[in-house]
A protein has these predicted regions:
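Mixed-charge, Lys/Arg-rich low-complexity intrinsically disordered regions
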Residues: 1-17
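Intrinsically disordered, low-complexity, charged/polar segments
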Residues: 2-3, 55-83
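Intrinsic disorder/low-complexity segments
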Residues: 14-17, 26, 48, 61, ...
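Short coil-to-beta-strand transition motifs
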Residues: 26-34, 70-73
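Basic/aromatic-rich interaction segments and small domains that mediate binding to polyanionic partners
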Residues: 31-63
């Protein structure tokens, strides 16, 4: 039996280590999305994480502060370890 433990320090984590992790997000419209994260790098050095196969960004990475934040439209989220 495996137990999923949330990754509490996702706000300061390097976005590359979040690739493939399970994420459960709740949108502002109370829609629950459950899936794996993929990394998208932007030309300006910023990055974002989104669910594999879904085009909406879930997490935005700011390279100036080396921090992550929830993207617009996301109310809450939990990130879990790789299974």
């Amino acid at each position: 039996m495996s137990v999923n433990v949330p990754l509490h320090k996702w706000r300061s984590a390097d976005p590359a280590i979040l690739i493939g992790r399970r994420c459960i997000a709740q949108t502002d419209q109370d829609v629950i999305i459950d899936g794996r994260l993929e990394l998208i790098r932007h030309p300006d050095g910023a990055a974002s994480l989104r669910f594999q196969g879904i085009g909406n960004d879930i997490i935005a990475h700011d390279p100036n502060t080396c921090s992550n934040s929830m993207s617009a439209g996301i109310r809450s989220l939990a990130i879990y370890g790789k299974e």
